[in-house]
Amino acid sequence: MKSATPDDLPRTGVEPDLSRSASECFESLWNGAIGMRSLPLTIAGARVLDAGVTCSGSLEAGLGLARLCLGDLANVRYVPATADDLVGLSVTIQTDHPVLSCLGGQYAGWPVSVADYFAMASGPMRCLRGKEAMLEQLHLSRQATDDDFAVGVLESDTLPGEDVIEAMADECGVDPSRLCLAVAPSTSIAGSAQVVSRSVETALHKLHALEFDVTRVVSAHGDAPLPPPAKKGDTIGGIGRTNDAMLYGARVTLWVDAEDDAIDSVASKVPSQSSDDHGRPFAEIFKQYEYDFYQVDPMLFSPAVVTIHSLQSGRTWRHGQISIDVMRKSFGL
């Protein structure tokens, strides 16, 4: 039998089953819901974990939602913040499956709109739904099998109704009983934490938008300050603070197996400061564009500081800067 050579092996090794890992994570959260001040519900046969809509949720629920988005293929935790972060805690993430966990799972690429209901959906269920160009380009979308559970997180200040559940299950190709959702608004503790855990995801999505081969990213680490939640019901405030934590406070480090020229061509463009919209609290930017995400410069949505280590040459690139004054204004400090 011929032995495999290094060139025969995938750069990042054999990838795990994202949907199965997410399903196991959901079971753990579902069984521990009460301890996380969350409420387990059944809606139209689907299991829905309320982590901040009608209940208070918790810091622990925030970590759980972040893990769920990532298919539990990343380590997410709270760490003491630095003086530059202005707050007490930061959310840190590290992963050795960056493309699968962050772009296949965590990216909020599904705008759920059914009748009067709207939510931004993330999680591995997106791969079963498909319909996203990025998932197709990265070969991450697939049809559901009889064994699959569609698992995801909704950012919304209301719970989905039966019509929403049925529509989402249909798009994922599963029975409603195999749909597993967690829901939290951006103004809740859990909702804030799961959004702020997206530091690495925003860097990878930016690289993909810059047409860099993101499969060359082998491992990644990121952190961002956990902002104080906005007042309950102030959705724009919640979106603003969590985005500002990312745009002006997030730091990401990527370990990349690529040639220097390829890295050099994009490194300075990855941080948020490369956008013309950079420099003001996101709530102000959002208002300028009449609260239409699609009018905001897509190059804005990225971390404040990005460091890239080349595994081929040993070189390091570091670009961007932390913007304390913008965060102070956004966080009401």
UniProtKB/Swiss-Prot annotation:
Subcellular location: Cytoplasm
Pfam families linked: MCH
Alphabetized Gene3D superfamilies for the sequence: Methenyltetrahydromethanopterin Cyclohydrolase, Chain A, domain 1 (3.10.340.11), Methenyltetrahydromethanopterin Cyclohydrolase, Chain A, domain 2 (3.30.1030.10)
Protein name in the entry: Methenyltetrahydromethanopterin cyclohydrolase
GO CC annotation, single: cytoplasm
Reaction equation(s) it catalyzes: 5,10-methenyl-5,6,7,8-tetrahydromethanopterin + H2O = N(5)-formyl-5,6,7,8-tetrahydromethanopterin + H(+)
Transmembrane segments: none
EC number of this enzyme: 3.5.4.27
Recorded superkingdom: Bacteria
SUPFAM superfamilies: Methenyltetrahydromethanopterin cyclohydrolase
InterPro entries: METHMP_CycHdrlase
Class of this enzyme: hydrolase
Molecular function via GO: methenyltetrahydromethanopterin cyclohydrolase activity
Pathway linked to the protein: One-carbon metabolism; formaldehyde degradation; formate from formaldehyde (H(4)MPT route): step 3/5
Species this chain originates from: Rhodopirellula baltica (strain DSM 10527 / NCIMB 13988 / SH1)
Family stated for the protein in its record: Belongs to the MCH family.
Function according to Swiss-Prot or TrEMBL: Catalyzes the hydrolysis of methenyl-H(4)MPT(+) to 5-formyl-H(4)MPT.
Biological process, per Gene Ontology: formaldehyde catabolic process; one-carbon metabolic process
Alphabetized UniProt keyword annotations: Cytoplasm, Hydrolase, One-carbon metabolism
